[in-house]
A protein has these predicted regions:
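A short acidic (Asp/Glu
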Residues: 37-39, 61, 176, 193-197
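Glycine-rich S-adenosyl-L-methionine
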Residues: 197-206
């Protein structure tokens, strides 16, 4: 739904073609959830779709888009796209990050997606994150995100996400593990674990 480190937007259809039949579809490392969105015509067979990400701000974006779509859209539209002053203000509000908030925080989700959509390739946000000035040559990814969550087709698939979690991958796998569940696991890139907000160690790839 947005640019994100390790997103599978362009590989999604190929990946989904190799999925076995299933009733529940789960991504323990949800990220931008591109495999679900791009290959939804193949995933629609699932009775239950489950999103999880250990990055609470990313999970919060999906929660707001799914359960508070009107309030989220209203908040998004309040802010001028491609404004460096707004970017820096939101950056000072959010960084360094904390997880002392509940899923459904629309204002926080708006600030996060504003930063995330206007930094290099949706890179993980930190103190060094810089504003990408498009100089009016292109529409910002912030505007593209607004278009998605106000589009009926995208809303249909957003509403098709039955459960949104902010848990460890172990917790999610243990909760949903059964013969009818398909887990698509796309963990942080090997040897690039430090690029992610969540604490995922190299040995955990095993």
């Amino acid at each position: 739904m947005f640019s994100y480190l390790g997103g599978k937007k362009f590989q999604a259809k190929w990946i989904a073609r190799h999925f076995p039949k299933h009733k529940t579809y789960v991504e323990p490392f949800g990220g931008a959830y591109w495999v679900y969105f791009v290959a939804n015509h193949q995933i629609d067979q699932a009775h239950t779709n489950v999103y999880n990400d250990f990055n609470k701000d990313i999970a919060n974006i999906f929660y707001c888009a799914r359960h508070k779509d009107r309030a989220f859209l209203k908040e998004l539209l309040l802010h001028e796209p491609q404004n460096e002053d707004i970017f820096n203000l939101f950056k000072s509000d959010l960084i360094p990050f904390n997880t002392d908030f509940e899923l459904g925080d629309v204002e926080r989700a708006t600030k996060y997606i504003y930063l995330q959509s206007q930094s290099f390739s949706g890179d993980t946000l930190n103190e060094k994150t810089k504003f990408i000035n498009l100089k009016g040559k292109y529409r910002s990814k912030y505007e593209h995100f607004i278009n998605k969550i106000s589009n009926k087709k995208w809303l249909y698939h957003i509403k098709g996400i039955n459960h949104i979690h902010n848990e460890s991958y172990e917790t999610i796998i243990n909760e949903y593990d059964n013969d009818d569940t398909l887990f698509y696991c796309d963990p942080p890139y090997f040897k690039m674990e430090d690029y992610y907000v969540q604490d995922f160690q190299r040995h955990q790839h095993k």
